[in-house]
């Protein structure tokens, strides 16, 4: 029998936002692109300061008012409401913003349209500069990021990591105070490296002085900057308030099904991490009884206002929440009625349910079903009132960049995702014939018997966290004269926040697969628990919801024996750590002033999950988990993958062509497993693996 080595085709995983393919191809930025890149780097620096640009913008920018240039925008009629709203009630930095409030959503919709409808790059620059000077900064960053993701002339433009643009959402107040301290003292005793004042601040998680509860022991996971930034970007890729544009129709990506699957997978990954600490099932959120886990983030706003904290055993059942709770009860009943009246058992039905629960623009009846997603966020936010009228101070749970820090996030979404499982209980159970791949057999799986995780130093550039002086003249600092304005008296500085972040040693697997003929197939890899927190083996009938997808790719099988090899560093939807703001600026300057090539690729794509979060921590003495491997017939998607966009520089959101195949998200675990022996087919294989963890500390004080 012949033997072949199959080179796995890089493909988009089913978990699409975890779902950009890892293309090794790259492009080189031309001069026009570098100009756009430079503008975005300039505009996102020190966002709360309006007068610190080292290369001043001309009078046409300073005097620009978009409502006086309506001819420069497509669909000007769609901007009229925003212009009227802004001129009567501007939303500035003396107001606290959250996209969750209907009133604030009006500004989001108008501002994103304004950026997106700009006819050319010059108009885009002018309106972005206008917004940078006048609009509430969190609103501005949110809107300009969305516009940059969807404008055709911005494809491939690399924005700095959100945790470096807005560090107040990610780093504790002590780290930010130390950053201010070094700056205020003129970087006294700080050595310059390559003519840059270089400060490294040891940054801790919120449990540095002791954990409030068992969940708080996992602050390294809850507060991971890359993981939280991923969730922020996912919700910017698929904003609930829009259907998308003509070329980016979000529902083509099965956005509702994706919404449910992403949160299911986040829950599965959280459960794996909890098991590493001998914690059990994630409790579902109960509005009527006190919540066991409190949380204190140690975060503060740019203006110094500390974020609310919650004590253990806190009750959300009080007068400020009664109305929200009543709405949850009403909409939940309507959703359950819809589920039980449903007579279709296809993927589109799941998509409809996800849209209903999120209450997004593609909901079949948003007025009737509301938004359970939003209502639960309002309940957790508790109606802390500020200002005038009915507005409440938006806490951590009202922002996508901070909501995952709080362990209650997982309790809430366990309740929300339970509606998905209620629906799937009405679907027919998969049988052996649904799982089998006739003529294909996984003969063996070759992978290490043990894997290793550890904590390692990670530096983020938080230079934006401190105020800088207005521009100075006569500086010879090359970065400063190029446009980077993190400086002290004309000399560049960088302030780095150093944290301990989870990581793992690379690993690889090889599948020996026999096929009776040449044919296309897909390979899927999951990791799941083997034992519960008490050491009891978990039957698959009670475990199927806990499997976390690691990889999904297409292969071509030849007749005979195939050896399918894959390294963890090549897994499709995992990305490398983000390049820091300073390093991005240095590369841009070198590419502008020399023959250095500014490469564009997807190795750090915003739509990918940090590679370092792939494996649960495990234990010092080893902890058994199980890998699940599947080889399955290839189902051609309705729209061929990568149609309509360039996967080298784009995540392809809204094109309907992100996915490697047409399988339901999460298959084969997407329906209840009532007979585990149905999984006893030749193209499935479970493999036990021990994960060892080096005994290192997560806080650095």
Curated annotation (Swiss-Prot):
Transmembrane segment boundaries: none
Subcellular location: Secreted, Extracellular space
Disulfide bonds: none
Keyword set includes Secreted: yes
GO molecular function: nutrient reservoir activity
Keywords: Glycoprotein, Secreted, Signal, Storage protein
GO biological process: energy homeostasis; motor neuron axon guidance; synaptic target inhibition
Signal sequence, start to end: 1-21
GO cellular component, one term: extracellular space
Glycosylated residue positions: 204
Keyword Signal among UniProt keywords: yes
Residue ranges the record marks as coiled coil: none
Main location: secreted
Superkingdom field: Eukaryota
Subunit and partners: Homohexamer.
Family classification: Belongs to the hemocyanin family.
Function according to Swiss-Prot or TrEMBL: Larval storage protein (LSP) which may serve as a store of amino acids for synthesis of adult proteins.
Name assigned to this protein: Larval serum protein 2
Species of origin: Drosophila melanogaster
Gene encoding the protein: Lsp2
